Structure formats: structure tokens, C-alpha cells
Amino acid sequence: MKQEINPKGTNRAIAFELWTKSPMPMVTFTKTFDVTRLCKVSRQRSMKFNMLLCWCIGKAASGIEEFYMLPKNGKLYKYDRMAINVIADNIKGGLSFCDVAVNDDLEAFNANYQQLTETISQTCHDILDDKAVIVGTSAVTGTELDSITNQYSGIFTNPFLAWGRYRKGWFKTTLPISFQFHHAQMDGSHAARFLEELQKTINTI
């Protein structure tokens, strides 16, 4: 459910006033994650690495209140559920998009992820959820990347995570992930907390 709320009645009142009309309100943090555990689970359970990472992102984000508030067109909206936007290659050689509902149950999330990505890949029709707050993702696995920035189009204000190919070392596998967020939605402290929670979730999946 999506509901317009008064920013003055939230903890985002000052930030909303300062940043909602900014020509560039987005901030990007980049953190290098230890994804050794994800690679192990992916192999052992025959689950896609990208799906596992998306599940961890949803798990970490869903526990932070600020993720459920989103500024758009000069207004602030509150949501009661969340989904992860996933991009998939389609049969026409282009890209298609789907929103996978956040779910604490990994098996259920995996089944939904597989069904949605397969459907959009074959039909070339996006499957989107306009009633959920969306956390965008993009896996650019054609190369290793240190950071991905400047994704702001002026239209989409939702949080967005992007990454390249993970890096295998002798003792661990690492992956730099860039996290972009609207400053009216959250402060650096909230973003840092999310990134810490994401690493903890990856470690304990």
C-alpha cells in the first residue's frame, strides 16, 4: 500500500526541506563486501548468486524504517511493503524488469525470483509492482567494477544498488557494491547501517 504523508510529521522533515528540490539529491556509497559465504551457499544449494544477494538486500533493507518512505514529485510517500527490482536479458536481446517481493523465506523468494525472471525473459514484458517501495538493483557482471555512480535520471528516486563481477582471492571472495539513495529519504548514518546489516546478512545466510 502506498500513502502520501506529511514530511513534517516524520524524522525526514528537515532533510525533505533541504533536498527535495535539489538538482542532484542522490548520494552514492561504495563498500567492498566479503561474499565468500554467498558463493558457498550458491554452490551447495544450486541457487543463483544474484538471487541470493537480492534476498540479502531485501532482508537488510526491510528492517530499516527509512526505506519505506520515498520522496517523489515534491511529496513524501510511505509504503507497507517492499520489492527488489531485478533486470534480466530477454529473448529479443534487450532488457526486461521485474519486482520481486521481499520475503523472509529464502525458498519462497527464490521460487518467485525464478518464475518472474523467466517470464520477463521470454515475454519481454515487465512485471512491476507500483504499490511497493522498490529497491533497484543492477548486476553488470561483464567486468570487475570498483564503483558505479551517476545513475540519477531525475525520474526515479528509489534506492539503487549496483555491482560488477566478484573477485576471487586465496582466502575470500569480495564484491564492491555501490548504493545510491535520495538524501531526503535517508541520511548517511541510515545508509551506513544498511550496508553493515547487508554484510551481516550475507555472513549468516
Task: Give the role of each language-model region.
Residues 26-30, 38-45, 93-107, 186:
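Acyl-group handling in specialized metabolite and lipid biosynthesis
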Residues 67-99, 131:
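Small-residue-rich loop/turn and linker elements
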Residues 90-145:
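Helical lid/core segments from catalytic subdomains that handle acyl or acyl-like groups
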Residues 1-16, 22-24, 37-41, 58, ...:
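Domain-scale detector for complete catalytic domains at protein termini or as standalone homologs
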Residues 5-8, 20-52, 70-82, 135, ...:
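Gly/Ser/Thr-rich phosphate-binding loops and adjoining beta-strand/alpha-helix segments
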Residues 40-63, 175-194:
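Acyl activation and transfer enzymes in specialized metabolism, enriched
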Residues 129-144, 159-196:
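Histidine-centered acyl-transfer/condensation active-site motif
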